[in-house]
Amino acid sequence: EKIKGGDRSSAIEREDSTKEEAHTAEIELLGLFAHSYQGDSRGAEVFTRLGVHTEYTDRGVKLTRKGTPATRLDEDMVDIPDLAQTFVVTCCLMDIPFRFTGLQSLKIKETDRITALITELRKLGYVVRSEQDSILLWDGERCPADADPVIATYEDHRMAMAFAPACLVLPQIQIDEPQVVTKSYPAYWEDLQKAGFKVCQNAMQS
């Protein structure tokens, strides 16, 4: 199958949807609070530098596009490796060069996420490089993009969630094996639809 266009690690994937909007956007995530016990709460700090304002309420958190994004992002992600895919994809789509360190654990996750990111982003026209099996960087280099890119998920839920909001920039993008999101966020596609995304699901023959 392919898809077209309360866990903080999963919910943070929604923040890149706000970030990539071409206009002011607002998303409310219920049940997430400032003093999270999950390390991924630091992701909100990083998104601030990309122009996403985080406001905590008694219901959860409200995310709003606000401010001027950084022109470059250098970040040690040793404490938030599960968010690396989201930030890598978001920065590329925003044309923000980056250098992310502390990613040594990505080689031994559900898939080799470093290689997967490099491979799939090339389909979108971005030449991302790695160093020392623990660093991902992009200096703005581009390459010819696929006309109708199909993103492989490698049986990795975070690959699907990191690339899905790219449809805001590339409406023709497709996500292969979308059901992988059930590992951490079973309602991900339904929630995207509620947020205003058009999600089309097609059965594909192997």
Q: Where do the model's predicted regions map?
A:
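Short, structured segments at the rim of ligand-binding sites
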Residues: 1-206
